[in-house]
Amino acid sequence: MKTFELEGKGREIVARSADQKRALKAMRKNNEIPAVLYGGEKVTHFTVTKEAVRKLVYTPEIFVVELSIDGNKTMAIVKDMQFQPVTDEILHMDFLEVSKDKAVVMEVPVVLEGHAEGVKAGGKLSLQMRKLKVKAIYDQIPEKLTINVDHLGLGKTMQVGALHFEGLELMNAKNAVVCAVQLTRAARGAQAKG
């Protein structure tokens, strides 16, 4: 998995109040995003710039983030983000501290490879799940999960339960469909004639 370097400035957190709301609004107007780092010994509240997180957020790739908050370096993953519903602007980010002895759950992009038998017979290959949830130590999680579909016939599906990746535990439902070769009208017509 790729590493993304991100710098943040620590911030003091006060109990929920009008002063805190004003401070958060001022941060956002100043192109800063409030963030929190948890999962370690203590919870750390900090801010990052919008420009710094743009390449981290608006990409299909996944990263482990090397956070530098006031000089202290920590490895983390993006756990959650809150967006403004109308402008789609990032309002808040949550980071989970990771270590080599504790497994984390992440969504990893799925990539299909090969030419399915069902497609050769006139079907259409469709990807139902773009990402799969996996549980593993963060440095064992790949950038993408590659699934070979050469053996997938016409009208057949590939379910999560049929997949296995070394060192990863799949967290999705076993009967969830990852991809399928669907019958097209032309393929149905050919089957009816034949």
Curated annotation (Swiss-Prot):
One of its GO terms (molecular function) is 5S rRNA binding. One of its GO terms (biological process) is translation. One of its GO terms (cellular component) is cytosolic large ribosomal subunit. The keyword Ribonucleoprotein applies. The keyword rRNA-binding applies. InterPro entries: Rbsml_bL25/Gln-tRNA_synth_N (IPR020056), Ribosomal_bL25/Gln-tRNA_synth (IPR011035), Ribosomal_bL25_b-dom (IPR020057), Ribosomal_bL25_C (IPR037121), Ribosomal_bL25_long (IPR001021), Ribosomal_L25_dom (IPR029751), Ribosomal_uL5_bac-type (IPR020930). SUPFAM superfamilies: Ribosomal protein L25-like. Signal peptide: none annotated. Keywords: Ribonucleoprotein, Ribosomal protein, RNA-binding, rRNA-binding. It comes from the Bacteria. This is one of the proteins that binds to the 5S RNA in the ribosome where it forms part of the central protuberance. Part of the 50S ribosomal subunit; part of the 5S rRNA/L5/L18/L25 subcomplex. Contacts the 5S rRNA. Binds to the 5S rRNA independently of L5 and L18. Belongs to the bacterial ribosomal protein bL25 family. CTC subfamily. This is Large ribosomal subunit protein bL25. It comes from Parabacteroides distasonis (strain ATCC 8503 / DSM 20701 / CIP 104284 / JCM 5825 / NCTC 11152).
